[in-house]
Each structure stands twice: as structure tokens, then as C-alpha cells.
């Protein structure tokens, strides 16, 4: 028994959502990769659900020839592997054509890290604009951006976790946030005094807006989700960076998450604690920050030791 590729993809995504609790971003990524592979194979008369190992290898070779990074190729293969395992487990296939395929080797780049000084400049600029904004529309945006930044640097949340915070988390114990992360796993993260103050100022103005009682999100917006889109936050952050005299290209929500982790380790935090705060399932993901510190230490010695080579 075989299935149309489009129906097979929809069934797979439904299973990933209902049974495994996959995040919306993960589902969208799977959809893009699977539909791209299905379209490419359909042009050659092959149904993705019936594809053989050679067909899958061909799609990966095409990606490589088109200049896609090894990480993109590995992501595509991962999506296909999950897809065919689903078809096998449901009895629609007798084999897994991805079983003998290997993802191209990828070197993990060291994360970009902002210095404490530059993070300070960014936060100071956000606080200044929040205090000086007079026009109501500009004031709510400035207070929101300041609250987002202080919370992000205080907690190291993923940007999707940050913009998707329910308003209830800011109305309970202000010293901590209860965050629902990847795989629907909850964790508690402490809030700094500055973050609590910035959130409270924003929340006071937010609650005075018409319709605010009906929106469950801490950072509401006129969007499909009902909360601020992560792309909007990233764009506002880059604008703030430019106004603070920083290179906009070097600043993003993810860079601030990296800064949170790196600065904690620089000041003596242990790796396990940082792992828990970041919500990493595997400590090997967190260990990349120790490599960043090692690189900086090596550079420091090389530049300043009188007998260094």
C-alpha cells in the first residue's frame, strides 16, 4: 500500500505534533525540507513516499551542487529519516531508504559573543529610549523592547520562548519565570532586579490598553499567533543596536542568549547550572561555550605574554 507524497507528509507532521509535541518551528522546518524533496523527485516521476536510497542520495547531491551548507544537507536528511521511519512504523513501507546514508560532516562554529561592555551599551540605550518616549505608541514599543532585552539577558531564553511567554508568568512570583521549552519541558529561571523592574513598567502600560485582558500573551501583537513575532523582535533589536553605536549585523536575540551563557561561565558559574538555565537536554550542547572561553584565553596569552610565540 502506498500513499501520495503530500498525504504522507501531512500524516507525518500530524504525528510529530500530536504524539511527540514537536514545536511549530520544527514542524515548519520538516515541512519545507520534505516538500522540497518531494517536488524535486516528482519532477523526475518519483513519489517521495516510494523513493529508494538512490533517490534520496540524489536530492542531497543536488543540494551540495547548489551550494547548500553541510548543516542544511544534514537537516534535510534528518527530516527524511524521521519521515521514512514513520512510514515504516505505520506499515506503508517495508524498509527505510535512509538507513545507510550519512549526513555530511559539519563543523560546529563557535557562537558569536557580545562583550559585557557592548551588552551594557545596548541595555542602557533601551532604558534611555523607554524613559524618554512620550508618544503613546512609541512608549509602549520602547518599554516592550527594554523588557524583552532585560529578560533575555537575565534568563538566556530562546527567542521563541521569550516572545511566547504567557502573561500569567509575570503576575506570579516575579523572582522567577516558569518557561516551557523544547519538548514541552518546563524549567524555572531566575529574574534579575533590572529585568523585573522593566517587565513591571511594561506590564503596567500593557494592562491599560484596550483588549489587553483578552490576550493571554505577555507581549501581545496583531499576528496569527497573537504574540510578538520573533522576526519583529530581531528587527527592532538590530535598530536599537545601530542607535547604540553597535554593528547591527553582530547583534541578534541568539547572540544575546550566547552572551548570557558565556558571561555566566566567565564569572564562575558551573557548566551544569548553565545547561539547566539554557534548557539544553545534552550537556555537550552547552560545552561549546567552554571552547569560546578557551579560544579567548589562548588569544589573551598570545597577545600579552612576553615570551609567547
Curated annotation (Swiss-Prot):
InterPro entries: CB (IPR044068), DNA_brk_join_enz (IPR011010), Integrase-like_cat_sf (IPR013762), Integrase_catalytic (IPR002104), Integrase_recombinase_N (IPR010998), Integrase_SAM-like_N (IPR004107), Recomb_XerD (IPR011932), Tyrosine_recombinase_XerC/XerD (IPR023009)
Pfam families in alphabetical order: Phage_int_SAM_1, Phage_integrase
GO biological process: cell division; chromosome segregation; DNA transposition
GO CC field: cytoplasm
Keyword DNA-binding part of the UniProt annotation: yes
Active site, UniProt feature: 158, 182, 254, 257, 280, 289 (o-(3'-phospho-dna)-tyrosine intermediate)
Location of the Core-binding (CB) domain: 3-88
Domain of life: Bacteria
Keyword set includes Cell cycle: yes
Tyr recombinase domain segment(s): 109-302
PROSITE patterns: CB (PS51900), TYR_RECOMBINASE (PS51898)
Keywords assigned: Cell cycle, Cell division, Chromosome partition, Cytoplasm, DNA integration, DNA recombination, DNA-binding
Broad class of where this protein is predominantly found: cytoplasm
Entry function: Site-specific tyrosine recombinase, which acts by catalyzing the cutting and rejoining of the recombining DNA molecules. The XerC-XerD complex is essential to convert dimers of the bacterial chromosome into monomers to permit their segregation at cell division. It also contributes to the segregational stability of plasmids.
NCBIfam families cross-referenced by the UniProt entry: PRK00283.1, recomb_XerD
Subunit structure and binding partners: Forms a cyclic heterotetrameric complex composed of two molecules of XerC and two molecules of XerD.
Protein name from the UniProt record: Tyrosine recombinase XerD
Species in which this protein is naturally found: Brucella melitensis biotype 1 (strain ATCC 23456 / CCUG 17765 / NCTC 10094 / 16M)
Amino acid at each position: 500500500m502506498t500513499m501520495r507524497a503530500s498525504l504522507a507528509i501531512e500524516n507525518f507532521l500530524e504525528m510529530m505534533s500530536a504524539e511527540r509535541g514537536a514545536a511549530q518551528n520544527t514542524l515548519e522546518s520538516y515541512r519545507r525540507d520534505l516538500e522540497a524533496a518531494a517536488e524535486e523527485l516528482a519532477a523526475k516521476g518519483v513519489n517521495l513516499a516510494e523513493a529508494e536510497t538512490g533517490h534520496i542520495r540524489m536530492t542531497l547531491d543536488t543540494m551540495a551542487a547548489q551550494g547548500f551548507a553541510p548543516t542544511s544537507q544534514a537537516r534535510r536528511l534528518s527530516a527524511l529519516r524521521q519521515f521514512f521511519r514513520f512510514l515504516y512504523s505505520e506499515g506503508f513501507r517495508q524498509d527505510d531508504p535512509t538507513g545507510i546514508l550519512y549526513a555530511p560532516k559539519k563543523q560546529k562554529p563557535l557562537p558569536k559573543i557580545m562583550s559585557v561592555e557592548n551588552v551594557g551599551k545596548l541595555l542602557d540605550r533601551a532604558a534611555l529610549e523607554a524613559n524618554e518616549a512620550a508618544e503613546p505608541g512609541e512608549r509602549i514599543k520602547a518599554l516592550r523592547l527594554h523588557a524583552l532585552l532585560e529578560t533575555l539577558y537575565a534568563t538566556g531564553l530562546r527567542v521563541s520562548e521569550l516572545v511566547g511567554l504567557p502573561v500569567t508568568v509575570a503576575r506570579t512570583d516575579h523572582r522567577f519565570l516558569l518557561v516551557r521549552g523544547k519538548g514541552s519541558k518546563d524549567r524555572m529561571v531566575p529574574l534579575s532586579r533590572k529585568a523585573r523592574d522593566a517587565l513591571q513598567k511594561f506590564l503596567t502600560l500593557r494592562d491599560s490598553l484596550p483588549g489587553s485582558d483578552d490576550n493571554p500573551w505577555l507581549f501581545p501583537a496583531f499576528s496569527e499567533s497573537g504574540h510578538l513575532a520573533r522576526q519583529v523582535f530581531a528587527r527592532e533589536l538590530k535598530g536599537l543596536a545601530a542607535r547604540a553605536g553597535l554593528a547591527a549585523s553582530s547583534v541578534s536575540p541568539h547572540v544575546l542568549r550566547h552572551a548570557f551563557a558565556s558571561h555566566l561561565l566567565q564569572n564562575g558559574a558551573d557548566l551544569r547550572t548553565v545547561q539547566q538555565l539554557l534548557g539544553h537536554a545534552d550537556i555537550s550542547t552547552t560545552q561549546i561555550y567552554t571552547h569560546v572561553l578557551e579560544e579567548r584565553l589562548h588569544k589573551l596569552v598570545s597577545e600579552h605574554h612576553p615570551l609567547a610565540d
